[in-house]
């Protein structure tokens, strides 16, 4: 978990935020990493689970600039009006991430995302809803490879992804660790080829992945 949290934290801090919103914060490990590196950060830690939020409160009890809110996505989150502010949605499925981003009361323009599934669908959603993917990176931990993305909605030019970019990622194809990249794409290919009744889209994904691996 340490590598993944460190990777997410670095992408958050690169944006030099005054505040962060960890949506689905679980036990608060990301917030701890962030305030260790920048003690002046204001953090809003939210989770649908009151038990998880209680654990986060205990972990961060010495940090007075932390807020803890039981909420499903943005339902009860306050806008602290600190700019820039970065949202984090990590460890959730791509479909749930899409649902949270689409909430009418989403007031954030910068996010770091770490989807557990439905990554291609997430990229399609981002492209269709004026989100620009600025960074894509991979991190390997305990035998699993995780994708982490930074996205924003403040670019003057809207990013429209091609079908191939939705599958491979607009930046991921340039990831420097080619061995990890091929391993990641192979895992994606294995997932799609295992489907019993592949759709036309599934077949297209398989074709694109086979071309690059």
From Swiss-Prot:
One GO BP annotation of this record: tRNA processing
Recorded GO MF terms: tRNA (adenine(22)-N1)-methyltransferase activity
SUPFAM superfamilies the UniProt entry points to: S-adenosyl-L-methionine-dependent methyltransferases
Pfam families reported for this sequence: TrmK
Keyword tags: Cytoplasm, Methyltransferase, S-adenosyl-L-methionine, Transferase, tRNA processing
Example of a GO cellular component annotation carried by this entry: cytoplasm
Coiled-coil region(s): none
Localization of this protein: Cytoplasm
InterPro entries according to UniProt: SAM-dependent_MTases_sf (IPR029063), TrmK (IPR006901)
E.C. code: 2.1.1.-
Main subcellular localisation: cytoplasm
Family listed: Belongs to the TrmK family.
PANTHER family: TRNA (ADENINE(22)-N(1))-METHYLTRANSFERASE
Name of protein: Putative tRNA methyltransferase MPN_351
């Amino acid at each position: 978990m340490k590598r993944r949290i460190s990777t997410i934290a670095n992408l958050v801090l690169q944006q030099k935020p005054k505040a962060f919103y960890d949506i689905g914060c679980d036990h608060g490990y990301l917030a701890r990493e962030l305030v260790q590196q920048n003690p002046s950060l204001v953090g809003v830690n939210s989770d649908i689970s009151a038990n998880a939020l209680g654990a986060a409160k205990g972990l961060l009890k010495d940090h007075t600039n932390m807020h803890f809110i039981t909420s499903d996505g943005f339902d009860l989150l306050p806008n602290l009006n600190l700019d820039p502010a970065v949202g984090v949605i990590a460890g959730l499925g791509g479909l749930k991430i899409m649902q949270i981003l689409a909430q009418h009361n989403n007031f954030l323009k910068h996010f770091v995302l770490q989807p557990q599934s439905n990554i291609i669908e997430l990229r399609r959603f981002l492209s269709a809803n004026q989100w620009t993917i600025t960074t894509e990176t991979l991190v390997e931990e305990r035998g699993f490879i995780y994708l982490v993305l930074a996205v924003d909605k403040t670019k003057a030019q809207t990013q429209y992804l091609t079908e191939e970019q939705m599958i491979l990622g607009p930046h991921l194809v340039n990831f420097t660790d080619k061995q990890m990249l091929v391993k990641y794409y192979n895992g994606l290919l294995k997932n799609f080829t295992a489907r019993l009744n592949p759709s036309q889209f599934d077949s297209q994904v398989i074709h694109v992945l086979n071309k690059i691996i």
